[in-house]
Every structure is written in C-alpha cells, then in structure tokens.
C-alpha cells in the first residue's frame, strides 16, 4: 500500500479512534472473568463452561488472522475495522440477550471475530498514514491502551 501521511491533528484523532477500539477489544477479552460469578449463577455454568466461553473468543479471533491480512491489504484498515467492529457489536448484543450456554458461546465467537482487527488494523493504518518516526510510539501507546482495557475489565 502506498503511504498517505496524515497531518498531525488528524493522525492523533485516528490514533484515539483506533485506541478506543483496542481498549474495547481488551475489555471484551477479559470480561468473562469479571462476570463469571453472575454467569455461573444465572446459567448454572461450570468452570469448564467458563473456559469454553473464554476459548470461544480466541477461536473467533484466531480464525480471522490470515483472512484479515488479505482484507486489510485489499480494502484498507478504515473499512475493515468498521465492518469488524459491527460484528463485535452484534456479538456483544447477542451475549447480553443470550438465554443459553450455546447462545453465550456463539456470541463470544462473534465478539472474537469482530475485535480481531483491532490491533492489526491500526498497525496497518499507522504504516500507511503516520510518519515513520511516529509509528513505534503509536504501537507502544496501543499496548498501553490494551493494558488499561484489562484493568478496567476487572471493575464490575
């Protein structure tokens, strides 16, 4: 892809939009641990069931990594991240409305698929839109945002 360097103000805005998506990705990744007492009570889940819910997220996430590279190269990060976050929203709403373990599991897989672009999409965008000297800093800040998402996921 050809570089198309953005002005600094636009680059900062783009970073914050991407960072919000990555924060939500981290939050959704870890939230089953926070919700485990409620899920165990409400759905009569075992520890194995909770593990499957956590694994469902990673199954969806991992299954998209190879197609994601192709899609990012073909359509660009803006379109792909938007489309994938829509899938994550659908999965999150489905999780909130689920009436059974299978509904929860399918929702977690959808969430994993939906947030699978929240790291590689921004990294691709930074490569295209940011000056070379800002890319490493943006990547480091993204990892900090991930950590913040994990911390915030511990709050009820």
Question: Where are each of the predicted segments found?
Answer:
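Paired small-residue
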Residues: 91, 102-110
């Amino acid at each position: 892809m050809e570089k198309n360097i953005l002005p600094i103000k636009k680059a900062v805005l783009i970073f914050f939009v991407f960072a919000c998506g990555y924060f939500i990705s981290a939050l959704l990744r870890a939230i089953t641990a926070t919700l485990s007492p409620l899920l165990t009570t409400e759905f009569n889940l075992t520890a194995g069931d909770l593990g499957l819910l956590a694994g469902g997220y990673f199954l969806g996430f991992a299954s998209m990594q190879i197609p994601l590279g192709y899609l990012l190269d073909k359509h660009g990060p803006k379109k792909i991240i938007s489309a994938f976050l829509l899938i994550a929203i659908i999965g999150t709403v489905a999780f909130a409305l689920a009436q059974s373990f299978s509904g929860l599991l399918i929702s977690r897989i959808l969430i994993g698929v939906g947030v699978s672009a929240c790291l590689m999409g921004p990294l691709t965008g930074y490569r295209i839109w940011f000056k070379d000297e800002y890319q490493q800093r943006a990547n480091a800040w993204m990892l900090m945002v991930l950590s913040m998402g994990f911390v915030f996921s511990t709050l009820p």
